């Protein structure tokens, strides 16, 4: 199993970024040197940093206006790694740079339930062989402490905070992707700032997002899904929710850009969750079995361009806990990180 670093990030924004960057400097420099953060392996055309600088700058300007603390943290990341500022920003924008690239097998299956004790769980399906780039960030933010799953220098991906808010995500394809706040930074801002499900939803509705996504939010009593398409948002709420990679809102579904093969995969995975039912929050074995069994598990076929399951998580907003299987969850050893452990001892197991 690949070692998963646990990084404690505290202090002012730039200091948090520097700590993150220094801790992973060798790994992130190697990643950036691998065909420009592996984008050269994934894109349909050659890529180089100089050609991407105007797009990176346009996104950075929006982020700096909307989320200045996180913009400063990205700049700190660059200093900590010892790389070009634009390279650190590229790490936050890889998905946006790829744009509407092929999505053929999966790109996360996510579900949440508040029927009993609250739980949010999901697979992380990515291309680029990113299971060697996983880290867990223990962040002391401006308002809340949080545990954040990160890949390849991302400031955010999914996680849980000490206000009892868990958030996950799914890729959906639609609308015009344009300079804005990348959804991963939006998730980090939610974890830093949100006191409640309502506030998390409000944040996601107000931010100028760069690309389409579906966000799953689970509090101690409510589960809500926010679908984002351009400047529009659709809110779904139920005691049990599941989402894959096609829009569920009927109006958004008419503008879905997912290809037919990916949509078939997305539907199969969604039906698999619905047919199995969401296990009780404390039934770790049943969650693990669901997350590590096809079609929800997307196996590796050896093609770096194809999405595969590179991690699976169970988030417990009531416990402030992430249970993580890094890599293929059917073979990976699980590990638990909790805010309570961090508060008590300053470390995790």
List where the protein language model places each region.
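C-terminal, well-structured catalytic/ligand-binding subdomain of enzymes
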Residues: 1-81, 114-349
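Gly/Pro-rich turn-and-neighbor structural signature
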Residues: 89-120
